[in-house]
Swiss-Prot record:
GO cellular component, as recorded: cytoplasm; small ribosomal subunit
UniProt source species: Lactococcus lactis subsp. cremoris (strain SK11)
Keywords: Ribonucleoprotein, Ribosomal protein
GO biological process per UniProt: translation
Protein name in UniProt: Small ribosomal subunit protein bS16
Any Pfam family hit: Ribosomal_S16
GO MF, one example: structural constituent of ribosome
Family: Belongs to the bacterial ribosomal protein bS16 family.
InterPro entries linked: Ribosomal_bS16 (IPR000307), Ribosomal_bS16_dom_sf (IPR023803)
HAMAP family on file: Ribosomal_bS16 (MF_00385)
Length: 90
C-alpha cells in the first residue's frame, strides 16, 4: 500500500480550505483517508497552516510521500528540514 500526504478540499464554493490528510494513493482525492495531520487555509493573508508535526514526521519516516503542494507547505513550516536532519543523523 503506497501512502501519500495530500490535500482534501473542504469549504463551500469559491471559499476553499484544505485538510492535510494521509491516504492510500489509490483512494480518490476527497475519499477515504487514514489520518488528518493538519489544515491549510489559502484565503487568509498569511496562508495559515496548522500541522501535527510529530505525526507528519512519523508518517514521513514510515515512507509516506507528500504531494508537491504539501511538500511546499511542509518546507515553509520547517518540517522537511527537521525530517532531513533526522534522516541524516541515523
Amino acid at each position: 500500500m503506497s501512502v501519500k500526504i495530500r490535500l482534501t478540499r473542504m469549504g463551500s464554493k469559491k471559499k476553499p480550505f484544505y485538510r492535510i490528510n494521509v491516504a492510500d494513493s489509490r483512494a480518490p482525492r476527497d475519499g477515504k483517508f487514514i489520518e488528518t495531520v493538519g489544515t491549510y487555509n489559502p484565503l487568509l493573508t498569511e496562508n495559515q497552516v496548522t500541522l501535527k508535526e510529530e505525526r507528519v514526521l512519523e508518517w514521513l519516516s514510515n515512507g509516506a510521500q507528500p504531494s508537491d503542494t504539501v511538500r511546499n507547505l511542509l518546507s515553509k513550516a520547517g518540517v522537511m528540514k527537521k525530517f532531513h536532519e533526522s534522516k541524516l543523523s541515523k
